[in-house]
Amino acid sequence: MSQDQDALTTEVLQRLRRKEGTWQDWGAGCRQLQKQGLSPQAIFEATGIEPIHQNQLITALQVSQSLGEAPESVRAYFQTRGSDLLYELRVLSAGDRLAAATLIVEKQLDVTAVHEVCRALKAVSYRKDNSEGFGESVGDRIGRYYWQLARQQRDLAQRSRLIAQGLRFVESASGRQALEKLLTDFTVVPAVNQPRLPLYRLDTAEEVPYLVPVAGTAPLTATVLQQVPRLSCTEVFRVVAVPQGMSLVALPAWQVLLNAVDPVAILWPAADLPAELPPSPEGLPIAQVLLVVDRGLAEWDRDRYLLIAPSPSEAVQLAWLPEPPTATVVGQLLLVLRPPQVLDESLNRELWFFEE
């Protein structure tokens, strides 16, 4: 970072620490600092603005900037306040944001009401009908949402509260009549139960797949092996950016792989292994295995099998060497994987139920 950038960063930090300007200035400052590489935690330590508040300010600023055609009265209203209100609008489309922002100003909504408005607009966003007398204005869409909830409510107090909420926002006369009708029509329409989320969780490290690039099938030269790009992943779900055309193999996240520096896989003839494999439990012959070699450990180790290259143009060899070799060490062998022996693949796709 240059001296000019250092000075600018210091100036922005000082303004934020002193809370100079409006919330929009604070959001712009936080965004600028994060783009310069400062972490939210570092900004918090220097300014006292907590990371969660930084995110709210930056997001609210983005929402404010998306209200391009908003009336001047709306833009002026949010100039010095309402970052928490605009933050709630982040889940809406650009058109709905503008309508909701205008509604906030007209009805002086607080953050709880804005949260409910956003939920209502999203809930009815996929229903484009006016069969019950509700139009497509933002007020009628919110009114329809509360009308739907009120019809499903057996408790009269809750039903009345929902009707009142709908009447607060509805704009059309027909929509208002539909809501007022519920004051005398106590028919309850059963709610359609929302399905449960298909939630899964990886309970052990080995359940998380570990992707290893595959260099190809032996024989391979050291040049080909070194040309395989190295993978990197992001936490928490180990998302991997894969170059186009790369082959991968998914393995359990065994500790030997997690500790590897730069692993790469090679399909290797079982007959060319430097030691004989023990027989498989099924007694089936093994023609090919998968080797995982760590290119980051390109040094001799008496206790490891090594992948060596007599020359860059010759095929690499797997060997155990009790003495340091004259050939180049390409990597150390991490594991030899035998092919899985699954008697019936269709069984893995069936649901199994067990009685306790």
Curated annotation (Swiss-Prot):
Q: Which gene encodes it?
A: raf1
Keyword rRNA-binding present in the record's keywords: the answer is: no
Transmembrane in keyword set: no
Cite the domain annotation text: Has 3 domains, the N-terminal alpha-helical domain, an extended flexible linker and the C-terminal beta-sheet domain. The 2 C-terminal beta-sheet domains are swapped and pack against each other to form the dimer interface.
Taxonomic lineage from the root:
Bacteria, Bacillati, Cyanobacteriota, Cyanophyceae, Acaryochloridales
Q: Where is this region: C-terminal beta-sheet?
A: 209-342
Q: Which organism is it from?
A: Thermosynechococcus vestitus (strain NIES-2133 / IAM M-273 / BP-1)
Alphabetical list of Pfam families matching this protein: Raf1_HTH (PF18579), Raf1_N (PF18578), RuBisCo_chap_C (PF18087)
What role does this protein play? A major RuBisCO chaperone. Acts after GroEL-GroES chaperonin to fold and/or assemble the large subunit of RuBisCO (ccbL, rbcL). Cooperates with RbcX in RbcL folding, plays the major role in assembly of dimers into RbcL(8)-Raf1(8) intermediate complexes. RbcS replaces Raf1, leading to holoenzyme formation. Required for optimal reconstitution of RuBisCO upon expression of rbcL-rbcS subunits in E.coli. Only interacts with the large subunit (cbbL, rbcL). Probably acts in the final stages of RuBisCO assembly, possibly participating in the addition of the small subunit (ccbS, rbcS).
Q: State what protein this is by name.
A: RuBisCO accumulation factor 1
Q: Which family does it belong to?
A: Belongs to the RAF family.
Keyword list, A-Z:
Carbon dioxide fixation, Chaperone, Cytoplasm, Photosynthesis
Question: Which InterPro entries does the UniProt record give?
Answer: RAF1, Raf1_C, Raf1_cyn, Raf1_HTH, Raf1_N
Its Gene Ontology biological processes?
carbon fixation; photosynthesis; ribulose bisphosphate carboxylase complex assembly
Which compartments is it annotated to reside in?
Answer: Cytoplasm
Assigned GO CC terms: cytoplasm
| Annotated region (N-terminal alpha-helix), positions in chain | 7-185
Oligomeric state and interaction partners are given as: Homodimer. Forms an RbcL(8)-Raf1(8) complex. Forms complexes of many stoichiometries with RbcL with and without RbcS. RbcX and Raf1 can bind simultaneously to RbcL.
